[in-house]
Amino acid sequence: MKLIWSEESWDDYLYWQETDKRIVKKINEIIKDTRRTPFEGKGKPEPLKHNLSGFWSRRITEEHRLVYAVTDDSLLIAACRYHY
């Protein structure tokens, strides 16, 4: 499964690399798990509603979520900082 980062999500990821390596490790673990099983597993996967319909979120920390969408052959990371 191909991994695609939105501009915002890549900026989020770079922010975590500079400020908190533990969160980067957690994000990497969640992405690895999501590539294997997109709709179940670590981080309590949850389908989003309304204007984010089609996207899913997984908990990174109490405050931050990984927001993503899955297509046939790719995983689009939309955000990995703050809530949706």
Swiss-Prot record:
Can you name the source organism? Escherichia coli O6:H1 (strain CFT073 / ATCC 700928 / UPEC)
Q: What is the enzyme's main class?
A: hydrolase
Q: What is this protein called?
A: Toxin YoeB
SS bond list: none
- Please provide an example of a Pfam family that matches this protein in its UniProt record: YoeB_toxin
Xref: Gene3D superfamilies: RelE-like
Q: What is its EC number?
A: 3.1.-.-
- Name the UniProt key words of this record, in alphabetical order: Endonuclease, Hydrolase, Nuclease, Repressor, RNA-binding, Toxin-antitoxin system, Transcription, Transcription regulation
Matching entries from InterPro entries are given as: RelE/ParE_toxin_dom_sf, YoeB_toxin
GO molecular function terms attached to this record: endonuclease activity; RNA binding
